[in-house]
Amino acid sequence: MKKHLNLLREFSVPLVAGVVVALFWANLDPAGYRAFDSTPFWGSLSFHFISNELFMTLFFGIAAVEITQSCMPGGDLNPISRAVNPLFGTLGGVLGPVLVYLGLNALVGLPELRNGWGIPTATDIALAWLAARMVFGPGHPAVSYLLLLAVADDAIGLAIIALFYPDPNHPVVAAWLLLTLLGMLVAWGLGRRRVRSYWPYILLGGSLSWIGLHQAHLHPALALVFIIPFLPHRLRESRHLFDDDPGDRSPLAQFEHEWKVVVDFGLFLFGLANAGVEFSSIGTVTWLVLVSLLVGKTVGIFGFGLLAERLGFRRPRGMKRRDLLVAGVVAGTGFTVALFVSGSAFSDPVIQAAAKMGAMFSLAAALIGMLLGQLLRIRKVH
C-alpha cells in the first residue's frame, strides 16, 4: 500500500487529478463549478480561499524546507555564492517574458492587451517543482536550482502585482508587514531558546506572519517562507536535499516528515480550485501569454544563467548547461500567480478569461521539458 501511495506522489497524480476534474467540471457545468469554488460557506471562507491561502501555506513551507536544506553546508546551493546563478536566472526569467509579450503585442497592434505584460513573469512553484522532479529525479541539483528560482520568481511576481496592478478596493498596507517581521523575531527567539518542537514556530511565528501578509493585502500563503529558515536543523551528510535521513529528529526535519505527504496529496485541492477554465475562452492574449512563458522563460533563464557564469558565479555542482536549458523550459509553467495577475490586469471578463487560458496552456512547458530531457539524455538522480 505504501509503495502505491509513493508512486502516486512520485507522478503527481493527486495534482493532475485535481486539474482534470476542474477542467471537466468548469466546461460541463461552469455555474456549478464557480459556485462550489467561490461561494462562502462559513463567514468569508470559501473552498478557493482554503485551498489557496491556507493549504498552500503548507506547500510553500515545505518548499522553504528544501531551500533551507540546499543552502546548508554540503547542500546543492552552498556556499551561498552558488545561489547567485539561480537568482540571475530569476532575473532573466522575469525580463524575458516581459520583452517577448510586449514585442509580440506591438506586432499584433492591440494596445488594450498591453497591460497583460506581468502575467507571464512568475513560475508556478507547485507544478514546476513537481515537473522538475519527474525530469531530473528528486536528488538532482537542478531541482533545488529551479525551486529557488521559482520562489524568487513568485516573490517578484507578487511585487509586480502590488506595484503595477493595485486593487483600488484593497491597496497594499505596508505597515502590517511589521507583524510578519514580528513573527520572524518570535521564530528566531524560539530557536535561541532551543525549542525542539516545530509547533511553536508554526503556530506563533507562522500565524503572525500569515496575518501580517493577509492584512497587508499580499499573498498570505507565503507566510512560512519567512519562518522555516529559523527552525533548528541538523547538517546532513548527503548533499541532496531529498535524501531521507531517519536519524534527523530536528524540528526542520520533523516538519518536513510529518507534512510532506499531506501536501503531496492535498495538491488535488489546489488543482481543483485553480484549473477550472472554459476552453471557449481562447483569444489573442492566450497566445501572447503562452509564447511569452514558453520562449521568454527559456531564453531568459538560460541566457542569464550563462551570463552569471561569465561573471564568475557557477552553477550548482553536478548541473550541466543542458540541465539549465531544460530547467528554463520547465520554468515556463505559469499557473497560480499568472491566473491571479490575469484577474488584476484586465477588467474585461472576456480578455481576462482568455489570458487565464494562456496560463493554463503553459502546463505544456512541463511536457516539453520532459521530452527535451529525454532528447538531451538527462540523467535522473534519485
UniProtKB/Swiss-Prot annotation:
The record lists the membrane-crossing segments as 11-31, 45-65, 91-111, 116-136, 145-165, 171-191, 197-214, 287-307, 324-344, 353-373
Q: Which domain of life is it from?
A: Bacteria
Which UniProt keywords are listed? Antiport, Cell inner membrane, Cell membrane, Ion transport, Membrane, Sodium, Sodium transport, Transmembrane, Transmembrane helix, Transport
Q: What is its main location?
A: membrane
Q: Name one GO biological process term.
A: regulation of pH
The reaction(s) annotated as catalysed by this protein in its Swiss-Prot or TrEMBL entry are:
Na(+)(in) + 2 H(+)(out) = Na(+)(out) + 2 H(+)(in)
Q: What is the protein named?
A: Na(+)/H(+) antiporter NhaA 2
Q: Which organism is it from?
A: Pelobacter propionicus (strain DSM 2379 / NBRC 103807 / OttBd1)
